[in-house]
Amino acid sequence: MGKNKTAYVCQECGYKSVKWLGKCPSCGEWNTLVEEFEPQSFSLVKKEPSLVLPVTDWEKEEHERETTGFESLDNALGGGLVKGQVILIAGEPGIGKSTLLLQISDRVANGKKVLYVSGEESGTQIALRAKRLGINNENLLVYPEVNLEKILQTLEKEKPSLLVLDSVQTIFSERLESSAGSVSQVREVTYRITEFCKEKNVPAFIVGQITKEGSIAGPKVLEHIVDTVLQFEGERFNFYRIVKVIKNRFGSTGEIAVFKMTDKGLEEVPEPSAFFISEKANAPGSVVFPHTEGSKPVLLEVQALVIPALYTTPQRRTQGFDPNRLALILAVLEKEAKIFTRDQDVFVNVAGGMSVKEPAADLAVAMAVVSSKKEKEVPKDFVIFGEVGLSGEIRAVHFGDLRLKEAKRFGFKKALIPKSLEIEIDGMEIYPVSHIQEAIEVLF
């Protein structure tokens, strides 16, 4: 092993410096650079040289998929777990990450061996939770340990079919002198666990904590090393949890799986669209929008509230929608449709805790604002989507036919869409519009 060297590493972003700095030049945070001792190289040397084969021969060794025991999660991952796949799952403390992984471990352990490595809880604590969840499986091995070298030795000995590491911030390597959870330790642990999983074809779930800003704690390289990144979201005092696929080398991103927290653990919600629009109120400011980020559209409720401004400067607040995009939409409404909100507070919310980034939501947000402003309901059997341009034009968006088919499946009979899409769906009335003023005239 090479001689250790000293570096000052930012604990927020992983930036390295040869000397201490008060402010990190990369992320701008203060007093985050900590002195760490690390080996000269983190390069991973293969025990055997890799094969050089034609791409067609590699395809013959195509990835076999293993189920997680949850159909909706399998679908979100692209069909299940791939051998050697390393999945990082991140979320707030207490949100239910360990509960979900314990349930997955139990379902995979039917006929296979699963190793659950816990750096946060004792074996007794995990056993108590397992009992509460009704888990009693001899193939589920629990190993409370924080030493990486001991964990790797146990993996070589037990040869599990699935590894769960809870969590990466609690594990340390003897190769480094820094404490567990430091940037260097997190990087080293992830590298070596990933190396083992790829070599032995063992899929793994690695739990990662998040920062107060909501991003994954640790260096960004952590997200690059793993194959898949899952974000586990939801309010701690709410029953529902959402797993979002942020990155996936073996499937599409943007997929979601919805779960309901019960006293017996997490239960999957097979129809996310039904969940997100189940409590929709027929009131001004409420619009249904068919959202698509992955392969399957999901119906979401977009809500807007327009009220007289309480202060000299009107407020613009959003939850789940880009505030800059809202500012653009309000400006277009004022110039092109004479809908003035300059002396009013405007609030926009995407119900259910979802975040929408695609411009296809523009028209839905605009119509929700107009609905609240005019205090007139949007007809309840309408779905709305389309991008709003600066001249008020309604621009085409992708997956228009899939969005409409999902809406029809849930009983929606009318749709306000961009005129340029030229889509017809049997059993649905399509209202194509080319300008935002046309859209307002159709609905109100």
UniProtKB/Swiss-Prot annotation:
Gene: radA
One of the GO biological process terms: recombinational repair
Residues covered by region (Lon-protease-like): 345-444
Positions with a binding annotation for ATP: G91, E92, P93, G94, I95, G96, K97, S98
Function description: DNA-dependent ATPase involved in processing of recombination intermediates, plays a role in repairing DNA breaks. Stimulates the branch migration of RecA-mediated strand transfer reactions, allowing the 3' invading strand to extend heteroduplex DNA faster. Binds ssDNA in the presence of ADP but not other nucleotides, has ATPase activity that is stimulated by ssDNA and various branched DNA structures, but inhibited by SSB. Does not have RecA's homology-searching function.
Broad enzyme group: hydrolase
EC number(s) on file: 3.6.4.-
Domain comment (free text): Has a putative N-terminal zinc-finger, a middle region with homology to RecA with ATPase motifs including the RadA KNRFG motif, while the C-terminus is homologous to Lon protease.
Gene3D superfamilies reported in the protein's UniProt record: 3.30.230.10, P-loop containing nucleotide triphosphate hydrolases
Keywords assigned by UniProt, alphabetized: ATP-binding, DNA damage, DNA repair, DNA-binding, Hydrolase, Metal-binding, Nucleotide-binding, Stress response, Zinc, Zinc-finger
Residues in C4-type zinc fingers: 10-27
Family, similarity comment: Belongs to the RecA family. RadA subfamily.
Record-given protein name: DNA repair protein RadA
InterPro entries assigned to the protein according to its UniProt record, in alphabetical order: AAA+_ATPase, DNA_repair_RadA, P-loop_NTPase, RecA_ATP-bd, Ribosomal_Su5_D2-typ_SF, Ribsml_uS5_D2-typ_fold_subgr, Rubredoxin_2
Stored PROSITE patterns: RECA_2
Motif (RadA KNRFG motif): 247-251
Coiled-coil region(s): none
Any one Pfam family match given in the protein's UniProt record, by short name: Zn_ribbon_LapB
GO molecular function: ATP binding; ATP hydrolysis activity; ATP-dependent DNA damage sensor activity; damaged DNA binding; zinc ion binding
